[in-house]
Amino acid sequence: MGRKNSPSAKKELVTLITNYEEAKAENRQLYLDADQLADIADWYASERKFEEAQEVITYGLKIHPGNTDLLIEQAYLYLDTQKLQKAKKVADSITEEFDSEVKLLKAELLLNGGKLEEAQWLLSTLADADELETIIDVVFLYLDMGYPDAAKEWLDRGKSRYAEDEEYMALTADYLASTHQVESAIIYYNKLIDKSPFNPSYWMGLVKCYFVQEQIDKAIEACDFALAADDQCGEAYAYKAHCFFYLNNSDTIFN
């Protein structure tokens, strides 16, 4: 499932998870819609808290049996935990076969089996194929599954319409970084920082590029900017530690 990226969506999700965990700790009933439970499960899975994710999905399907959002999350959870056959079985049980999220799930299952052409055909039938959100989902799907050429086809699909859109620029930067076009990626991340200087993900994009180039001082500086934007950015702390280790300056980590 797509992750919550906007600040307002993230804040709403944090509140939702807090309410859920408080109710659970107090053994108190808390009614939540299926999509809310799916979002909570998705977050747990993204944090690799697979048992908690399964607990939410199991509870959700008891009060919302057969719900598509929850079944999609169940299938992805099986994928995350290397249970491919169970994921396929759940995907096959979903009745809303024309739903875009269902098609994305089934495409991932096909790619897991090396069936690129079948996945390409399925994704070509997406009703919202020209929407930016869909393009982003498909590009990352292909990149994650190791098909950069297929990802490039979908990236190009949105260029004429979305070239100046910040989300599309971020997608382009991530694609360039993922395909080792580091210099071009740096140019895009800097453009994004000019647009949104307090977005830590853009700074982290720069960090990774500089680290690959072994420009460690620049990587550390970018880490500091990422932490200035979000002092809870664990990835920035981790990369900063890697940088100091690389410089054989391990004492600095503990000072």
Each model region followed by its residue ranges:
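Register position in tetratricopeptide repeats
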Residues: S46, D80, N112, D144, ...
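Canonical positions in the second alpha-helix
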Residues: G60, A91-I94, T125-L126, R157-G158, ...
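Short coil turns that delineate tetratricopeptide repeat
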Residues: P65, E97-D99, A129-E131, Y162-A163, ...
